[in-house]
Regions:
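Soluble catalytic domains of enzymes that build or remodel membrane lipids, polysaccharides, and related
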Residues: 1-128
Length: 128
């Protein structure tokens, strides 16, 4: 097993920015995933999961969206820190191309310090 950390360039946190990063751009910052090993990627922002999966992360652990700040039953998170309504990867487990993403709602809040139907969360992941 190999654990990689990826620091997303600041331009990807700007409001109204396109929501895609290529695997090639990720490779410019961190090494290629190791062949024959289970590769875990720590990436703060889950919005770019497709790029992380194409890079080769078997499992990506992420947060940033704070569960969507407030949550609606049957709908999920309402707004992201980038002011995007109904973010796709707000909280929970997702899969793409056979790769997994785990997103926690986290313990803190964003610039608006409130949570509605969105309790603080600490995620414990067991690997075996």
């Amino acid at each position: 097993m190999t654990v990689h950390g990826f620091e997303l360039p600041e331009k990807y946190y700007k409001r109204f920015h396109q929501q895609y990063i290529s695997a090639e751009e990720i490779r410019k910052s961190i090494q290629k995933p190791e062949e024959g090993r289970y590769n875990i990627l720590l990436a703060h922002n889950p919005v770019y999961f497709e790029g992380y999966a194409l890079w080769g992360a078997d499992l990506t652990l992420s947060g940033h969206l704070h569960g969507g700040l407030m949550r609606l039953p049957l709908v999920g998170g309402v707004i992201s820190p980038q002011v995007k309504l109904f973010p796709k990867y707000d909280c929970g487990m997702y899969e793409k191309y056979g790769r997994k993403l785990l997103v926690t709602a986290g313990l803190g809040s964003h610039s608006i310090a409130f949570r509605i139907n969105n309790p603080a969360e600490f995620m414990l992941v067991e690997l075996y």
